Structures are given as C-alpha cells and as structure tokens.
C-alpha cells in the first residue's frame, strides 16, 4: 500500500505545465549546473544534513513553482469554460433566430405568391382580396418547402439598381464567412431574402404601372389635372422614398458591419490585453528568477573575494602552486564579473520589454474604455431621426385611429343587441312568472295529496307488519303441532295394534279357560273337590285371567298363561309409558317458558309406575308353580289382585287423559308465553334455561330416590328369598351401587340447595317477567285498539282519497285550460322569436361588416408585425455575422500569440547563442595559460565521472526519470523496474512504466 501511495504522490507531483516542461527541455542543452559549496565538513553526517537542507530548499522552490503553475492553469480552465458557455449560448440563439428568419421569410413569400395568384385569377373583386389573403396563407415547414430551390434566372423579373446593390452586398458579406456545414442553410436564407427583395421590387413596379395607367387615363380626360399632378408628385415621392429606404438599408448593413468589426476589434484588444497581462506575469516571474540568480552571484562573488583576500595565500607551501591558484581565482573572478555584466544587460533588455508591453496595455485599456463609453451613451435622437422609426410611427397612428372607429361601431352594435335581448328576456320572464305561479298551485295540491297518500301507506304498512308477525307466530307453532299430530297418530296406530293383540289374547284365554274347566271337571271327579270349583264366574275369570295364569295349578297350562299375562302386562305398561312419554314431550316443549312445578307430576308418576311394573315383571317369573293344596286360595288372591290392577289401570288411564287435556291447555298457554319470551332479552332467556335445568335436576333426584327405594325393597326381598353366593355377590354390587348413589345423592342435594337458592332469584325474576308479560298484554290490547282506530281512520282516508281524486280531476281540467293559455302565449313567443331572428339577421350583417373591418385591421397589424419581424431578422443576421467574427477572433488571437511566442523564443535563443559565444571566447582565453591542459584533463575526468551511472559506475547515463529528472543508465533503471524497486536511487522518488525515457547526450 505504501508503494501505491508513493506512486500516486509522485504522479501528482510530476504533472507540471506543458509549456514549462518544453522550456525546460529547450534549456537543458544550454544551461550549466552550478556547483554547490558546502564549506568545511568534518563527518559524513554533517555532509548528509547539509545535503538534506539544500534538497529541502530546492523542494520548497519547486513547490512554489508548482502552486503558481496550478493557479495559472485553474484560471485558464475557468476562462475557457466561460468562453465555451458563452459560445454555446450564442450558437443556440443564432440557430433559433435563424430558424425564425427562415419561417417568416417563407410565410412572407407564400403570402405574396397567394396574393399574386388571387390578383391574376380574380382582379374584378379587389374588395374581397384582402379578406381572403389571411385565410389562404398556409403555414409551411422550412424543411419541406419548395423555396429551398431558388428560381431560375429566366423566371425572375429584372431588379432595380438599389435592390440589386442590396442583394449583392448581402451575398458579398455572407459567402466569405460561411463554413462548409452551413452552406446549404445560408444559400436558402440568401435565396429567400433575395426573393423578398424581388417581391418588394415587383410591387413597386406594379404601383408604378398603376400610376402610369392613371396618368394615361387622366390624359384622355380633361378635368382633374390638379389631382393628376398630385398623384405624379406622390409617385415621385414614393419612388424617392423607396430608393431612400433601400439606400438606408444598405447604409444600415454597412454600419452594422463596421460596428461588428469595431466590436471584434474591441474583443481582440481585450484578448490582447489579457495575453499581455499573462506575458507581464511571465516576465515578472523571469525578473524574480533573475533577481534570485543575481543575489546568488553576488553571494558567490563575495565569497570569492573573501577567499581571494584571505584563504588562497595561506593554503599551500609551494609558490608555483599558489601562483596557479591565484591565477585561477582571478580568472573565475573575471568570469563572474563578465557573467554579472551579461545578466545586467539581459535584465535591462527584459525591463525595456516590460515597459513597452505596459505602455501597450495602457493604450489598449484606454481605447477599450473609450469604445465602451461610446457604445453605452448612444443618443435617442439618432434612433428617432431614422426613417424606419418615423414610418412605424405613422402606421401606428393610422391603425390606432381605425381601431378607435371600429370600436365605436362595435359598441353601437352591441348596444342594439343588448337592448333587443333585454326586451326579449323581460317578456320571457313575465311568461315564466305566470307559469311558476300555476306550477306552485299544482305543487301545493299534489303535496297535500301525497301527504294523505303517505299516511294511508303508513297505516297499510303497520297492518301488514302485524299480519306478518301473526303469520310468523303461526308458522313457529305449525311445526310443533305437526310433530304432536305425528306422535298422536303413531300412538293411535300402536293402540290399534295393542287392541288386536288383546283380542287375540282374549281368544286364547277363552280357549285356555275352557281347557281349565275341562281339567277342573276331571279333577273334581277324581279328587272330589267339586264344591270349590262348581261356581265359576266368567266375568271374574275374564277379569282375573292374569292372576289365574300366574297361579294356575295345571302343568300344561302354566307356561301359556304366563306368556299371555306377561304380554298383557307389557302392553298395558307400554301404553302407559307411551302416554307418559307423550305428556313428557309435550311438557318438555313448553318447559323452556313454563314454571318448574308443571313438569314434575308426570315425571313423578313415571317413577311410581316403573317400580310397580318392575315388581310385576320380577314377580311374574319368580313365582313358581305352587303346591296343589293352596291353589284355590291363591286363585282368589290373584283374582282380587287382577281386579285391583285393572281398576288401577283404568284410574291411571283416566288420570292420564285428564293430564293430557291439561297438558294441551298448558301447551296453548306456553305457545303464547313462548311468543312473548321470544321478544324477551337474552338475560331472561338464560334465567328460564336455568329454571328448566333446575327442574330436570329435581326430576333426576326424585327418580334416583325412587330407584334407591326400589333397590332397597328388591334387596330386602332378595335377602329373604335367595341366600346363595350369587345373591351375596348381587347384594355386594347393590350395596356398592347404593353407596355410589348415596354419594351422588349428597352431591345432588348440594346442587339442589344451590338450585333452590337460584330458584328464589329466578322465581323473583319470573314474577318480574310475569308482570312484564302483563304489561305486554296490556300493550297488545292497546295495540289492538290502535289497530281498530287505524282501520277506522283508513276507511276515512279512503273516503278522503276519493274526494281528493275528484278534486284532482277538477285540477286536471284547470291544467288543460292553463295549457291552452300557454299554447297561445307560445304562439306569441314564436312571433317574437321571428322578430328576433330578423333582428339577428340585421345584427349578422353588422357583424360581417365588423369582421371585414377587423380583418382589415388585422391585415394592417400583420403588415406592421412583418415589418418588425424583418427588422428583427436583420438584427439576427447582424448578430450572426458578429458571432462569426467573434469565432474568428480567437483563432487570430491564438495565431498572434503563437507568433509572439515564437519571436520570444527566438530572442531567448539568440541570447543563449550570444552567451555561449562569450563562454567560448573565455575558454579560448583560458587555453593561453601554461597549465591549461592539466585543468582540461581534470575537467574531462570530472565530466566523465558525471556522465557515468552512479549505480553501476560502468555504463554511461542514457535514461532520465521524468519524476525527479535524475539521470542513470537505461539497464539499471529497467532492472530496478523489473525487480519492483521502483524508486530513484538518489532522491527515493517513486516512478512508473511511463516515467523513464532514453537520453542521447552528444
């Protein structure tokens, strides 16, 4: 990284100004390196320190020189950038104005050609020609125009002498200054301008022909000689003015060229002044250099004098050697004096050159200031006295007067138009006010009818909403009713099946009873037990059939009777359970809104009926065939039991039917409550759900209690009947189940207590809900009353609507009458519109006249604008020529500067030649002395030592490092470069591949 940084530093440091490098290369052949006197040195360290001090001085001088060169180069770069920016801006402006010039010249020529065509085709309509010229002129593109090709000479009309002179002046002024890339454009511009001049000359000739026709016509007619003389005078004056205008244009062109030349001279003098300033700075720098050199020489001279006076007489022992040294010191002293005189002469000559340049600079500055003052203080009287200014002033006054007349006519026409419009608008406003009054009446009546209609619609909407609510309630109750009907139909079908089974079992029972009677008869004959069985009761047997089947003594009849009894008991139990399930389902539907006490009886009865059924089922199979001795007593008991069971079943059916009726009534009430609770808030619904859950929990608790009782009774019975291991195992299981159920009972009791506490709260809430239901029922009654009132009001509204329809029909008839009046007024309006059209036609004529006059005004304005554009175009041409001259001036200044530089270098070379001649003469004088050969030999050795490479001390110096300008042999430099030791052996300055070159010393 250090090597790279050294390379960059060396590269930056070596970039000096090219001019200085050239001067340095020129002077290397002539300048002599002065020896440096280090004085008395006692050691190598002291010598190194003195050498380093001298090197530091030299480096400081080089740094100052480099900074000065950098400042000069920066100033020069800034000047060049400013000049380039100004040149670009002027080029852009010239290009833009040149394009505008081409477009305007093409438009002028096209306009003139169109006027010529119109005048040649229709000379009998001169009044319309001016109006048409404005519409016929097309906008042509300068790049695609046919004007790029100039007309041939045979089709051009002959020009007058002033016009020819003007065209020739234009051609002579532009052809010499045009470059190759702009020749086509310049040719087009010259051709266009020449054609414009031709057109103006042709117009002048047409005017002269018209004047001659007028004169000839006037010669045939006697009266009007004064007018003819006046026209002749005017024609002569017009011709004279046209000649004067062309002459003035030529003069303006010539003056503009002279002005541009003067301006170019001013710019050239300014550049000269700048160059002189730079040369003065260079000369001052040379003077400073010479002064420094003079000071050095003075120091050397003083040292030589001191050595001459003191040191050389004491330095040696032999007189010959001392004498030789004295002669050498005297010779050096004379040489130094001669050099001092030469330098003084050179300084005097340079001073004379500087004074001369200073005088030239002051003269150029004075002329520049004088020209600037003259340019700034251009008087206005000169501008006002020009013919163009006076002509434009006269045209402006004429156009201004015409515009004032046109404005007055336009104001009069606008006043008439406004008066007619105001009268028409007043009539229309009167009719509109009448129409608005009638419309307001109609609107008020229609608004009243709409209000009544809106009231009727509101009543209708309220009735419709109530109907939809009732319909929705019926739709909600419909699915429940359908489910109940479906359940009832399924239960009826089941009852029919059970009835069929009962009939079949009765038939089988009769057959069994007949067999039993036969068996009894056989048994009475065999065992003499006739009195006990001689009084059978058919009704009793029919009623006590299940009991008999259970306690029948016959071995063959017992299984059938047991099966029939089990089926009958199952049928009755199924019927009762189905009815109970029907009641439970009906109560569950209404349970969400009904109080908790209504659903408990059916669930309470169900656990009461279940243990009886289970006991019957257990007792049925558990009763085995009794012994033959106790058959009659058991038969009586079974009959009594069967009668009691049938009586209980009939009572149970009656109770279930009554409960079914009550449940249906409660279901209807619950439907109403359900509709009411659907509109209740969510909190009350949650309370009702809690109450329903509480009822279910209570029912489960009761059911569990009944099951526990049944299980306890079953355990007692089984403990009496069964004493084997199976019974004990069942008892243990039952006890475990009892413990589990007791634990569950304790939990349910706790839940029951919590639910009871909640029931108190929910009961209070239920009472509040009942009060709210009462209020809602009251509101429903009030709504019904309001609905009845609305119905009555609706009837009244229908009657009012009929009356309003009749009034509307009457109003429609009135509207028809008003429409007829409006039609009549429309007829009058049409007549007024016809009058307005007639007025508008007259107004259109006035406007046409106004447009014609405005077109004439615009034509005059266009002529004025064209004249102004022509002046601007001429100015642009002038600026273009000036820019061309400005472009040429830097080239001239550069060539002049190059010549001056060459002359300056020539002078310097002559001075160097004279100095070398004087040195040669001095050397020739030195050869006269006796020991000159020895001196020359020593000098030759010294020079050879200087010419040998200090690195290898064998080869000659033939390569120079451009970074520090130390000289070595090419092989050493290349070897160090290839070995990547890219630093100078003397000053340790880094160098690159392009920083060492061969040197040929001759």
From Swiss-Prot:
Its EC number is 2.3.2.27. It comes from the Eukaryota. GO terms for molecular function: mRNA 3'-UTR binding; protein homodimerization activity; syntaxin-1 binding; ubiquitin conjugating enzyme binding; ubiquitin protein ligase activity; ubiquitin protein ligase binding; ubiquitin-protein transferase activity; zinc ion binding. Pathway: Protein modification; protein ubiquitination. It is found in: Nucleus. CDD domains: RING-HC_RNF40. Residues 1-32, 120-148, 520-562, 579-652 are annotated as: Disordered. The keyword Magnesium does not apply. It is an enzyme of class 2 (transferase). GO terms for cellular component: HULC complex; nucleus; protein-containing complex; ubiquitin ligase complex. Keywords: Acetylation, Chromatin regulator, Coiled coil, Isopeptide bond, Metal-binding, Nucleus, Phosphoprotein, Transferase, Ubl conjugation, Ubl conjugation pathway, Zinc, Zinc-finger. The modification Phosphoserine is found at residues 42, 585-586. A zinc finger (RING-type) spans 949-988. The modification N6-acetyllysine is found at residues 20, 356, 518. The keyword Iron-sulfur does not apply. InterPro entries: E3_ubiquit_lig_Bre1, Znf_C3HC4_RING-type, Znf_RING, Znf_RING/FYVE/PHD, Znf_RING_CS. Pfam families: zf-C3HC4 (PF00097). Its main location: nucleus. Component of the RNF20/40 E3 ubiquitin-protein ligase complex that mediates monoubiquitination of 'Lys-120' of histone H2B (H2BK120ub1). H2BK120ub1 gives a specific tag for epigenetic transcriptional activation and is also prerequisite for histone H3 'Lys-4' and 'Lys-79' methylation (H3K4me and H3K79me, respectively). It thereby plays a central role in histone code and gene regulation. The RNF20/40 complex forms a H2B ubiquitin ligase complex in cooperation with the E2 enzyme UBE2A or UBE2B; reports about the cooperation with UBE2E1/UBCH are contradictory. PANTHER family: E3 UBIQUITIN-PROTEIN LIGASE BRE1B (PTHR23163:SF4), RING FINGER PROTEIN-RELATED (PTHR23163). This is E3 ubiquitin-protein ligase BRE1B.
